[in-house]
Amino acid sequence: FLEKDKEELPILYNIESHFVYNSNPHTSTFNSSNEIFNNTHRLIVNAMKSNMHAVFTDCPHREKLGWLEQVHLNGPGLFYNFNLSTFAQKIMQDIRDSQLENGLVPDISPEYVIFDDGFRDSPEWGSASVIMPFMYYEFYGDSSLIVEYYDVMKKYVDYLSSTATNNIVSHGLGDWCDYRENEPYGVSHNTPVPLSASAHYYMVVD
């Protein structure tokens, strides 16, 4: 092996990193007299950028699948900060391509992996198929996604209705990774799954 004298080793003076994310234009700015607010906003925007690629991921350090709950939970922040006119269309087309014949919308889209149970069928995730077009309309005054994907939306609502007992939907992951002390993360621990599942059911039929 080759051994070099320590004095000959290169010296690291600076490291720069660059965000790699898709081409959604950044459309807004935020500035206040409070640096905590400014830095918090910058952190949030950078976190959203880090998750925007061909799909919207839920954590940039490891997750590479398009978990759909992130689309509507982060939706307002995304719409306020970025132009989603093409990205939202792409997400809805992925949802259409992934939707099963019975109307189920998988938790991830595109469905590169077929999971089991709540990791494939959870109302809090699948409801993005209905919430996203209406959110698009709310922010842009553009009903094109509702018109184009109405069949997808209706099929999903009909599917959820078929799973309900006395208008209560009881399946899925619920409030995934809610707070717990000294226990592994997982399916909702503090909130009954039927509560959040049915809440999302009512959101999509409203």
Regions found by a protein language model. Give the residues of each.
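Short alpha-helical scaffold segments that flank and stabilize functional sites
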Residues: A47-S50, M132
